[in-house]
Each structure stands twice: as structure tokens, then as C-alpha cells.
């Protein structure tokens, strides 16, 4: 992801979330050495989805992921998440966490299919009082690390 991608990224973000990230938030992720902001483009060169993840020492976190509405249900979200896992694993991460709205059944199902487990709950986490599930993915041993790359 680069600053040139932000117009399309912000449009997807605004369509996907009730409280979207701002341009400044995305710019901070682009500029951070620990962040891994990635975009996926379609054949026409339009951004179809993106993911922002970060890492500190051996812990990674998926911060934001969204797929353009007309591209959903085609495996792009899975590809973005598994690419982030592979990239974070290559950087020495042994676990990856994320927070997801309790009502976001499709995202929760996707994360579970990939191997994330629900490990906690943040009550009233979002502005509207909605809870967030805490989910985690663990890279168990060197074999898993090699497979993830």
C-alpha cells in the first residue's frame, strides 16, 4: 500500500465500517517500520481489498482488513489474511491477534477457517456498545513457520 492507493482504500474502508479509519491513520501505517499494509488489485488494476497488520517482537496483530463489496465471497479476504500471516511469520512472529465485531459472522467464520481461535471478549468495545471477540492464531513450531511462508 502506498499513499497513491489511499483514495480507493478509503472508499472501501468507508463502505465497510461504521467508523472508518482516516487518511492520516492509513498514512501512519504506511510510514511505520512495523506495519505491513498490503493491497490486492484486480486485473484492471483497481484495488479489490487491503489488510493492515503490525508486529512487535514475536507478536503480530491484524489491525484492519476489508474487501470491496463487489469482490466479496471470492476468497480475497482469505488470501489477504493468509498473506499477512506468511509475511508476519517470516518476520519472526509466533502469534497473531485481532479484534472483530461480535456481529461480523462472515469475518469470524473466515478467521476460524484459517485457524484463529476465539480467546476473549471485550465487552462494549465499540461506540455503539457492541462487543469485540479477541481471536488468536498461533504458529506452533518451525514446521508451521516453514509452511506459512
Question: Where are the regions a protein language model picked out?
Answer:
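Short hydrophobic clusters on alpha-helical segments that form packing/core surfaces
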Residues: 84-88, 96, 107
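C-terminal "cap" of GNAT-fold acetyltransferases
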Residues: 94, 101-105, 124-149
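Conserved short alpha-helix immediately C-terminal to the canonical SAM/SAH-binding motif I
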Residues: 80, 104-107
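Residue-level recognition of the GNAT/N-acetyltransferase active site
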Residues: 68, 72, 101-103
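Conserved active-site tyrosine of GNAT-family acetyltransferases
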Residues: 111, 116, 135
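Glycine-rich phosphate-binding loop
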Residues: 75
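Acetyl-CoA-dependent GNAT
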Residues: 3-70, 78-91, 120, 138-149
